[in-house]
Amino acid sequence: PAIPGDGSAKGSLKVVGYGTPSELADANPALKTFGVDLQIANDVDADIAHAHTWYACLAGYLAKMLHGTPLVITAHSLEPFRPWKREQLGGGYNLSSWAEKDAYEHADRVIAVSGGMREDILAAYPNLDPDKVVVVHNGITMSDFATPADDDPGWAVFDRYHIDRSKPTLLFVGRITRQKGLPYLLKALHLISKDIQVVLCAGAPDTPEIAEEVKTAFAKLDEERGNIIWIEEMLPRPELNALEHGCDAFICPSIYEPLGIVNLEAMACGLPV
């Protein structure tokens, strides 16, 4: 990530980081985002503005109105299909929904990451011209998920977290959020055989409340069945790759997933999902 206020270049690519204005340090998260968007829109000097999700939609839409910059949006999720975000944003959910709707309805092109996502976009925003909505699927670089060599340092993750490679193992990778379904998975795991080892790579909780909910559910599950490992840190790619190659199946309990990258990565490692 770029450091706020810092401009760096790699070849012809210039990356500029923005921070939340100090006046909004204690504001609702949606207002903090808008504060960043206003700075971006003010600085835009480009032929095309390309925004991803509502976090940058307002910046792109303002740039279009201010400077006549064509706006392209890539849709990875939609606010109307994520009502649980109100738990995180409070009234800010009304703001994020408003910003997304206005930006989508005035965009010059909207990219959906799957066919299902395109259908959702048109259902959520019927005023949007269908001819402006195209599908460009998410993808991954397959070579990044090749089977690690026996001496690959990534395998160290098994020893560090005491994961038994001789046991049948299920793997979950995702943020701690309603959308990713971890609270529901923890309830369901009471129903499977205690002989099955479960590894949860889960962090970055949406709210302190859901963090505590997951912590309590994990403790109860660990006491009742054991054989479960929780990795809260974000693993480096070599270790996550080794973990995916060393487990037997990948669990995706998401209740909303337009096209999950983690599922593609797991399949690239040969894991059933």
Which residue ranges define each predicted feature?
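N-terminal strand-loop element at the rim of the active site
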Residues: 1-30
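Nucleotide-sugar donor phosphate/pyrophosphate-binding loop at the beta->alpha transition
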Residues: 69-72, 80-102, 119
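Carbohydrate-associated surface elements
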Residues: 116, 139
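A short helix/loop element that forms part of the nucleotide-sugar donor recognition site in Leloir-type
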Residues: 146-163
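Nucleotide-activated donor-binding/catalytic signature segment of Leloir-type glycosyltransferases, i.e.
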Residues: 167, 200-202, 211-234, 238
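A conserved mid-protein helix/loop that constitutes part of the nucleotide-sugar donor-binding site
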Residues: 168-172, 177-191, 212
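Short alpha-helical donor nucleotide-sugar binding micro-motif in glycosyltransferases
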Residues: 241-247
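Aromatic "clamp/platform" in nucleotide-sugar-dependent glycosyltransferases that forms part
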Residues: 255
